[in-house]
Amino acid sequence: IFVYSSIMDNNAIDNKFFFAIFHSISAFCNAGFSILSAGLYDEAIRFDYFLQWIIMTLIVLGGLGHNIVFNFYQKIKTHVVELFDKTIIHKKVRIITLNTQIVIYTTLVLLIGGFIFLFISEYNNTLLEHNSIFGKITAASFNSVTPRTAGFNAVDFTKMNVPSLLFIIFLMWIGGSPASTAGGIKTSTFALATLNIFAVASGKSRIQLFGRRISSESTSRAFAILCISLITIGISIVAMLIFEPKGTPLLTVAFECFSAYSTVGLSLNYTPTVTEPSKYVLIACMFIGRIGMLNLMVGLLRRLNHQFYEYPKENILIN
């Protein structure tokens, strides 16, 4: 309804009802598909800032995950019941889970940090076509949201500065949240890896956050996912550089591989020109990124028998 109302007076769009349904589903599912040839950068809707904020909201909600949204629903429902039914005595229950808190805080940091960085980096570049300050804020915000991992383009990414492209690669790599429609290594994985670094630097043997202790199994899994993703993407980049003509920019190839692994769909307009072997590399990268290399390895290598013994423990020198 909101998407339809934003384009109701736009004569350049023919089937407005279908446009609204298609883009709403595409945004919430983090698909990034558009029926317009230039996507949301099309001249017909390039400066429709109301539409862009609606699309951003749908992308974020889809990228948070159904369990996070349901957790907030439980919280709101409890507050409403307590507000209108004073006769019921409720015990203080921890409704918002630790997973929800980690996902929300990490998402906010990435969104706000991404907006500030891209607003400063692109202010005198791709944001110049937006005359108003509100337009520049909207464009910078959209560029911070869409790499994780919707894939809509509201600017020409080929004209972006190198620092901006590197930061977008970073956002694409992280992606959305667990049990969501987004790809990437996930916000909780990045958060746990970051928290573990600070815990090790502080001399702590465990991660404690918001009055809860995070299991070592979760931390190990997070680092495994992080390392496997970088190895997979690195192999994909090397493979593409072998198959592509000499002189192909490394940044362009890296951008395509990170986008493929996280199933983002953003491109520097290079994908249509890649060689046949490189297309298979990108296909494999997308498949592994969507399924998860760790999940594939667990499915192939995990044994059914359980070990009921332990070997002696010994420390290894690191750094």
Give residue spans per PLM region:
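Membrane-proximal intracellular helices of multi-pass ion channels
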Residues: 1-319
